[in-house]
Amino acid sequence: MKELGMVGGLGPESTVEYYQTIISKYQERIGSKETLPEFFINSINMYQVFEFIEQDNLDGLTDYLVDAVQKLEKAGTDFAIISANTPHIVYDQVQNRVHIPLYSIVEETLAKAKEKDLDKIGLIGTKFTMEHDFFKKPFTLSGKELVVPMEDE
């Protein structure tokens, strides 16, 4: 079985949500609640991520995330995920510098929207995620409308 690595801690609540979902889906697939998946979580400091973003230091953010994924590589993982939307602004740069597949939350969300034949999708996230086009652009290019709430909403 392939080994998953997750960059978590972005915030801790989403890491817990991912963890519980992974366990639930794994047990569903195996057909038993008497087993748990083995995988690695590298919990990083979300406030460091926010600092890089506030300083518009995307190179620093890239380096920080590359280091996080490389630790998962060294642990023996076969692929990785980042458990938050906002860090995906540097997804391509990170993927280009690591040796294992890094699944994109943006591309996976778009694939699910296509699978369900959805043309209009709502996005709720950090202000940064909702203001920048790294999430919106792939949807627009695929003919999907990504709806973002107004600031007062």
Model-derived features: positions:
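Glycine-rich, highly charged phosphate/nucleotide-binding loops
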Residues: 55-74
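N-terminal glycine-rich "phosphate-gripper" loop used for MgATP/nucleotide binding
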Residues: 76-91
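Secondary-structure junction motif
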Residues: 128-136
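Metal-dependent catalytic neighborhoods of phosphoester/phosphodiester hydrolases
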Residues: 52-53, 91-97
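N-terminal glycine-rich anion-binding loop in soluble enzyme alpha/beta folds
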Residues: 1-60, 136-153
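Conserved beta-strand elements of the Class I
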Residues: 5, 119-124
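Short, acidic/small-residue loops that bind anionic groups at enzyme active sites
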Residues: 30-33, 94-114, 148-150
